[in-house]
Amino acid sequence: MKRENVLVSEDALARQREFEAKIKEMFTAREAHPVACVDTFGCQQNVADGQKLMGMLADSGFTFTEDPKEADLVILNTCAVREHAEQRVFGNLGILTHTKKENPEQVICLCGCMAQEERVSQRVKESYRHVDLVFGPHALWKFPELLWQVYETRKRVFAVDNEDGTIAEGIPVVREKGVKAWVSIMYGCNNFCSYCIVPYFLLSIRSLLPCTDSHSGFFCLRF
C-alpha cells in the first residue's frame, strides 16, 4: 500500500507547544532546572534533527550538557546506515545502565532511523529496559507529547509505527555556534539502491513548501 506524505497542521504543532509548556511548568513547580544531553550519530540530516530536538527541549525549559552523568534527560539520536554507528549506540546504551542506577529519575531516549528498525526497537524493549522512550524520525515533531507521556505515566513509550511520511515546518531549533546551519529542504529518497536502507526508513522524497519561513535559514547566517 502506498504511503502518503502528510503536512503537519499548525494546530497539531500548537498542541506540541502546549506539551512543552506542561513540561516546563512541571519542572518549575519542582523548583528544578532540567538538563539534557543530546548525542547525535550519523549524517547532516541527523545533526539538523538533533538541533530540532534541542529547540523543543529549550522551549520546555531545558539547558544542555555533553556529559550524560549530569543530565536529567539523555537522547541518543541514531543513524541506521553504518554498522559502526549502530554498535556505538548499543555500547552507549550499556554505559547508560550505570548512569540510570545512579540517577533513577533520569529519562533515556532512543530516536532516529535506528529506532525505526523493528529488530532494534524489539531488542531495546527486551534487553535495554532502562530506555524510557523510543521513536522513529516520522514522530520527531511529536517529541514534546511523547516526552510528556513518559513524565506523566512513568511508563515506557514506543512510537515506531510505520506511519505516512510527515512534513513538519516551524519546529524550533538550537544551532551550534559558528557559521554553518543545517537546513533540511527535502527528506527521503525514491531510489531503492540495493546497498541503502534510507528509503525504507525515510520513505519517498518530500520537500518543504515553497516560500515559507523555513527557507529563511539560507539568508540568516550571522558572523
Give the residues covered by each predicted segment.
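Proteins enriched for Cys/Gly/acidic motifs involved in redox and nucleic-acid/cofactor modification
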Residues: 1-223
